[in-house]
Curated annotation (Swiss-Prot):
Residues 268-280 are annotated as: Specificity for association with VLDL. Residues 81-252 are annotated as: 8 X 22 AA approximate tandem repeats. The gene is APOE. This is Apolipoprotein E. Residues 211-280 are annotated as: Lipid-binding and lipoprotein association. Residues 1-18 form the signal peptide. One of its GO terms (molecular function) is phospholipid binding. Belongs to the apolipoprotein A1/A4/E family. The keyword Glycoprotein applies. The modification Methionine sulfoxide is found at residue 144. Its main location: secreted. One of its GO terms (cellular component) is chylomicron. Sequence repeats lie at residues 81-102, 103-124, 125-146, 147-168, 169-190, 191-212, 213-230, 231-252. The modification Phosphoserine is found at residue 148.
Length: 306
């Protein structure tokens, strides 16, 4: 990561060596400005800048439609919207990267932020100058002070070429600085993750040792408590067995007393009922005897035949 950052810084410094474009005479062929294809598929700010670039390229054609709209405020209004969208996306992306620069040293972060802010301001100034130049052209066309429309268009085309080239240069400079900013954020994030990983590893090891140191006394206390509990259970079991024997003896004593009382009660009942039974038997025998006597007395004697 450090090597990548160093390469990006060298590239950034090399890109800052901008050549001053000489002024073009009217009718002189314009040098070809390479198209930034990378703006078509990148960060949101790059896409927004690509839309500004495409619109500027259309204006630079100075077609009849362009010249007609230049006489109104249509073109400058469109450029204003595109410029504001681009700068808004640049600020959003910069803020996103700043949030990732937490672990980076404050002096490095301040330096990178200052350089990035300057590149951002240059890009905004380039777009602002394009808009101002088109506004100036509209005023010149409306006044036409000793100049022909052809001369005004040629001068505008020359200025737009220079501004377009400067815009491309400053956009690439901003792009490189943002790349450096992002590389710093990634390196800082990796450092932070590495530090967190080391810290967590240390905490885990400390926790493991502390747990081992704490668990040993706990195991010893649990073992001692188990021994005491086992002894207490054996003691309680012995007491319960002794108590059970006592209860069994008491139950035997109660059973013997109950049997004794039952036998006594049975003997008492027998003593009560035997005389009554004998008396009833005697009375019954006497009654039967009386009945037999009465029956015999009432029967007539048989008569003799003469």
């Amino acid at each position: 990561m450090k090597v990548l950052w160093a390469v990006l810084v060298v590239t950034l410094l090399a890109g800052c060596q901008a050549d001053v474009e000489p002024a073009l005479e009217v009718g002189e062929p314009a040098p070809e400005v390479r198209e930034p294809a990378m703006w078509q598929s990148g960060q949101p700010w790059e896409l927004a800048l690509g839309r500004f670039w495409d619109y500027l390229r259309w204006v630079q054609t100075l077609s009849d439609q362009v010249q007609e709209e230049l006489l109104s405020s249509q073109v400058t209004q469109e450029l204003t919207v595109l410029m504001e969208d681009t700068m808004k996306e640049v600020k959003a992306y910069k803020s996103e990267l700043e949030q990732e620069l937490g672990p980076m040293a404050e002096d490095t972060k301040a330096r990178l932020s200052k350089e990035l802010q300057a590149a951002q301001a240059r890009l905004g100034a380039d777009m602002e100058e394009v808009r101002n130049r088109l506004t100036q052209y509209r005023s010149e066309v409306q006044t036409m002070l000793g100049q022909s429309a052809e001369e005004l268009r040629a001068r505008l085309a020359s200025h737009l070429r220079k501004l377009r080239k400067r815009l491309l240069r400053d956009a690439e400079d901003l792009q490189k600085r943002l790349a450096v900013y992002k590389a710093g954020a990634q390196e800082g994030a990796e450092r932070g993750v590495s530090a967190i990983r080391e810290r967590l590893g240390s905490l885990v090891e400390q926790g493991r040792l502390r747990a081992a140191q704490t668990s040993q006394p706990l195991r010893e206390r649990a073992q001692a408590w188990g021994e005491r509990l086992r002894g207490r259970l054996e003691e309680v079991g012995g007491q319960a067995r002794d108590r059970l024997d006592v209860v069994r003896e008491q139950m035997e004593e109660v059973r013997a007393k109950v049997e004794e009382q039952a036998e006594a009660f049975q003997a008492r009942l027998k003593g009560w009922f035997e005389p009554v039974v004998e008396d009833m038997r005697r009375q019954w025998a006497e009654l039967i005897e009386k009945v037999q006597v009465a029956v015999g007395a009432s029967t007539p004697a048989p008569s003799e035949k003469h």
